[in-house]
C-alpha cells in the first residue's frame, strides 16, 4: 500500500505580497489588475509584482463569479441539470449542455440509442457555437490591442449566429436545448434554408477577420513571441485547446476520442508551431473555417434525415409533450397542448410525473470529455440510482488554462499580460462556476 502524503499549497493576498516585497527591500510595485477591468474577460483579479515595466511575479485570483452551480445540480433532476450547465461558460454554452448529456446517456447506457438526427443537430449547434466563441475571442483580443475593426466584424457575425440559435431553440443564450436522449426540438420549417444561408455568409465574411489579423504588422508585433508556452509547459500544466495546438501537437478530442460521430466527418485539426499568442489566434481563425466544413456536411445529413426522430423512443426518458419556446416567444400550438392535456389522461399523468419527478439513472460514475471551444471540457457525474445527481463536477478548460498565465507572463513586459490573457480566452462563468 502506498504511503499517505499531505500536500499543502500556500497562496497569498495583497497584504502578504506587500510584506514580502518590503522584507526583500526591492524597488518593486505590486498592482491589482482587475477584477473590474475590461481586459480581464470577466471578474478576474491579477496580482502583479512589477520591477519597472517587467513582470516579476503574477498571481491569478478567481472566484468572484462563483454561483454554486455544481452543488445546485444535486437538488435538481437530471433534465433540470442542463439549465444549470448552460450557464457555466455562457459564451460557449452548448458545449456544456452536450458534455453533460453525453455523460448522463453513458450512465443510462443509451449512447447508441440516440437518433442520428439528434447527433447531427448536436454537431451543428456546437460547431456554430465554436465559431461564435472564437469570434468573441479574436474580436475582444483585437479590441484590447487597439484593432476595433476586428471586434466590429466579430460581433456582427456572431449576431447572425445568435439569431439562428433563437430561431432553432427559442433563445439567444442559456438555451438548455440539448437534453439527455437527444434535443428538445427539431429544426423549424425554414431551418435548413436558414442554415444554408448562414453557411454562405460565414464563407463570405469570416476571411475578413483574417485580413485584419494575419498580416497586420501591428497585430503581429503585439502577439508574435508574446505569452510563450512550449509543449512541455502545456503538458505539465494540463493546458488544452488552441494553446496546446499552438505548440504543434494536433490534440483534438473530436479526432483522438471521437463522439457524436465526429470520426465520420471530414475536417482537419488546426496546428501552429510558434507557442505564442499569434499562433493561438491563427488557430482559432483556421478552426472557424474547419467548422464551416463540418456544417456543410451537417446540412447534407439533415436533408437526408428530415422527418426522423430527434429524441430517444424510451418513454421513461423522452417527454410525451415537446413543450418548448418558439422564436416568437410563444409556446407550442393549441393543437399540441390539446392532445397532451385534453385528450389523453394517461399522457398528462405521465408527462406530469416525468417532468416533476424525473427519471432514475443507474448507480455509478462516469467521466465524459469533449473538445470545447477553449480545450478539453469534461463532466464527471456520480449517481446513487436516484432522480438527481449525487455529485457533479465540470472540468472547464478556462480554469486549467488560466493557471499557465504566470508561466507566460513572468519575465515579460506589463503590456504583454493583456494579449497573453486574451489568447487563452477564459470565460469566468466557466472558471468560477
Curated annotation (Swiss-Prot):
Q: Report the EC code(s) recorded for this entry.
A: 7.1.1.-
Q: Which domain of life, per UniProt?
A: Bacteria
Q: Which reaction does it catalyse?
A: a quinone + NADH + 5 H(+)(in) = a quinol + NAD(+) + 4 H(+)(out)
Q: Do the record's keywords include Cell membrane?
A: yes
User: Cellular component GO terms, alphabetically?
Assistant: plasma membrane
- Record's bilayer topology term: Peripheral membrane protein
Record's keyword annotation contains Metal-binding: no
Could you tell me where this protein is found in the cell?
Cell membrane
| Entry-linked InterPro entries | NADH_Q_OxRdtase_suD, NADH_UbQ_OxRdtase_49kDa_CS, NDH1_su_D/H, NiFe-Hase_large
GO molecular-function terms, A-Z: NAD binding; NADH:ubiquinone reductase (non-electrogenic) activity; quinone binding
Primary site of residence: membrane
What does the UniProt record say this protein does? Answer: NDH-1 shuttles electrons from NADH, via FMN and iron-sulfur (Fe-S) centers, to quinones in the respiratory chain. The immediate electron acceptor for the enzyme in this species is believed to be a menaquinone. Couples the redox reaction to proton translocation (for every two electrons transferred, four hydrogen ions are translocated across the cytoplasmic membrane), and thus conserves the redox energy in a proton gradient.
**Oligomeric state and partners?**
NDH-1 is composed of 14 different subunits. Subunits NuoB, C, D, E, F, and G constitute the peripheral sector of the complex.
Task: Report the NCBIfam families cross-referenced here.
Answer: NuoD, PRK06075.1
Family listed: Belongs to the complex I 49 kDa subunit family.
The molecule here is called NADH-quinone oxidoreductase subunit D
Q: Which species is listed as the source?
A: Cutibacterium acnes (strain DSM 16379 / KPA171202)
